[in-house]
Each structure stands twice: as structure tokens, then as C-alpha cells.
Swiss-Prot record:
InterPro entries associated with the record: Ribosomal_protein_uL29 (IPR050063), Ribosomal_uL29 (IPR001854), Ribosomal_uL29_CS (IPR018254), Ribosomal_uL29_sf (IPR036049)
A biological-process GO annotation: translation
Record organism: Colwellia psychrerythraea (strain 34H / ATCC BAA-681)
Coiled coil: none
Membership in a protein family: Belongs to the universal ribosomal protein uL29 family.
Protein name as it appears in the record: Large ribosomal subunit protein uL29
Record keywords, A-Z: Ribonucleoprotein, Ribosomal protein
């Protein structure tokens, strides 16, 4: 997910994207804790995407 794509979205769309990413992170965490997640790098990618979305939301809220 690119930052330019995120900046083009509205705050409502970003909040929906954030909720989806948080659900995805939860699912990956559960899979990792039960030993079912083979691609552990996905946790890091999702965590960083969450940070990106939160940063863009904060930037838009400040304007």
C-alpha cells in the first residue's frame, strides 16, 4: 500500500481501512500463536501499514 494511495482517500475510507488492517493483524497474531502462520513477515507488514494509515489520519485531522 503506497502513501500516495492513502493520501487520496477520505478520512472515512481511511478509518475503514484501519479497521480492516486491525482485523487482519488480529488474525495473523492468532495464527502465529497457534503455530499456523508460515509467513511471519506478514505481521510486520500489517503493523507498518497500520502506522501509515494512522499517520495519514492524523495529518488530515490537523488540516
Amino acid at each position: 500500500m503506497k502513501v500516495s494511495e492513502l493520501k487520496a482517500k477520505s478520512i472515512e475510507e481511511l478509518n475503514a481501512e484501519l479497521l480492516e488492517l486491525l482485523r487482519e493483524q488480529f488474525n495473523y497474531r492468532m495464527q502465529a500463536s497457534t503455530g499456523q502462520l508460515a509467513q511471519t513477515h506478514l505481521l510486520r507488514i500489517v503493523r507498518r501499514n497500520i502506522a501509515r494509515v494512522k499517520t495519514i489520519i492524523t495529518e488530515k485531522a490537523g488540516k
